[in-house]
Amino acid sequence: MRDFAAIDFETANNERTSVCSVGVVIVKDGEIVDTFYSLIQPEPNYYNYWCSQVHGLTREDTEEAPVFPEVWAQIEPLIEGLPLVAHNKAFDESCLKAVFRCYQMDYPDYQFYCTCVASRKAFPQLPNHQLHTVSEYCGYHLANHHHALADAEACAWIAREIL
């Protein structure tokens, strides 16, 4: 796959609507041509301990952040006509659909691919297929795991190798 948008969400709590950050990496002709990152005010607007432990974000980080529709208005032109790629499609696609429903936005039925599923087929010998393991195997060192843009970059790197 040579043209796509890799996307990653982090959530504030266990609600899929609680996206608190997003990273997007645009790949055209196999090259990264653009990136986007934003904090997002989550809905519902509370952080649970475990989610904050994973990504390091807290309510203070996002209290002045834009809400999802404002952020998506910036992302939409970047991804127009591109399939979306995520390392755990089940999570990221469900977040995207949930937050669209939450804000009563029409969901455009994006075409989604999963690098995690693809990596299980491409690299069955790996001890696991977590993002950092697969990206390292593909030659990308994921230094800031669970930062949405860093995770989207790692996903893009993997997708260029195996999709």
Where do the PLM segments sit?
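Catalytic-loop motifs flanking and including active-site residues across diverse enzymes
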Residues: D92, Q111, D151-A154
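Generic alpha-helical structural context detector
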Residues: V117-R120, E136, W157-R160
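Conserved non-catalytic scaffold segment of RNase H-like nuclease domains
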Residues: M1-D109, P124-N128, H132-H146
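Short, glycine/acidic-enriched loop or turn micro-motifs at the edges of active sites
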Residues: T11-N13, V117, A154
